Amino acid sequence: MPNITGGAGEILVVMDQFNWDNSAGEMLQDILKEELPGLPQSEPLFDVIQITAASFDSFYKFHRSIVMTSIDSNLEPRVRFRENIWAKPQIMVQLEAPSSSALHTLIRENEARIQSFLVQYDRDRLMATYLDSKDPAIQKELSAHHQVRLAIPRGYNLDFSKDEYSSVSIEA
């Protein structure tokens, strides 16, 4: 299976323009662009890219995080959380509904589940990346002096380490 494309914190939403510009799309945008708490400046949870189903081709199929909406009168409302459909490690939230109003209701009723799934999976992937690139020497030193286990990425320098405190920096 191919590797994912797209950056950390980036969500690809596949939704027709009419719904994107109306209540279902606005609600989905509110969920995905909610302000991150605790930062000194306003930052959204995710950077959101919206495309239509007609534009969703082999280039976009490998995106790391996809929210795909489908509206068809033959569909029952449902949310599916899927992994590794076209690439690895990929996630997808599928939202299916028989109408625009049913899609809006489906999004509203599953707001917390949708956001939690996307946030947790993105966080887990980011942590795995840092764990894969950690500097074991700095980790060992910090553990010995402070009884704490931190995954410090390679490229950082341990300026000094004492029993009371340590200093780690990176040259920009």
Give the positions of each predicted feature.
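N-terminal targeting sequences that direct proteins away from the cytosol to non-cytosolic compartments
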Residues: 1-172
